[in-house]
Amino acid sequence: METAAGARYSTAPSHRGWSVPGTPVLVRYADDLVALCYSREHAEQVKERLAAWLAPRGLTFNEDKTRIVHLSEGFDFLGFNVRHYRSTGKLLIKPSKAAVKRFRARLRAEVRSLYGSNALAVISRLNPILRGWAAYYRTVVSKQVFAQIDHTLVWTMLKWGRHRHETKSYRWIMNRYFGRFHPARQDRWLFGDRDTGACLTRLSWTPIRRHQMVNADASPDDPALAYYWRQRRRRRLPPDTPTAPAPAPYTLRRPQGLA
């Protein structure tokens, strides 16, 4: 596919794996594809080449989802928004507005389904969802979005408390379910269960760690690079995920009853 689109990469030792200037860069995941080009005319040429490559394989572009846009307008890809900001001259990758909207809606739906449950059940249901979403977006510019969702979730949980204790005031609910539950954090507005000490995790606790580019020509199928890929996977572990313990050494034992 890359060859058909005209993508070429440098073979020079100092720039091995870099795209040759003037050629497109393709990023593909499953059936989602982004082609980064130098102009609209260049993008249209690449689209024609790819359409010709897909046709013999019985495939076509979905014209309703295929767009040619300038990077300053930005585009969404796999839940991320990629955009070049002329005011700062920076290209930023953030959680897309659509992805954030879907996640907020999911949290509200989950909490509504738990109106009749206790605090511990709510925490047990929401924490894996929060950690998973934070792990997915922790490599991009997500700090502000994380803080905004944390703030919204406080009000969502206050509403949950109001439904669970209809005759109680908001002050009573705050005193009952909110406080400094995490011993290593100074957050005062943590939703928690006072009987067990468990608390709702916060997205903003997830440190932002930028994606580290894969070395050129590094294939996961190369046995000589097993250690390299093992180290990369270890760095990509979500927060609060323990690494797998090393396997115990094998020992030989003589079966009982045999000489």
Language model features: what each stretch is:
Residues M1-A259:
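Non-catalytic terminal/accessory segments
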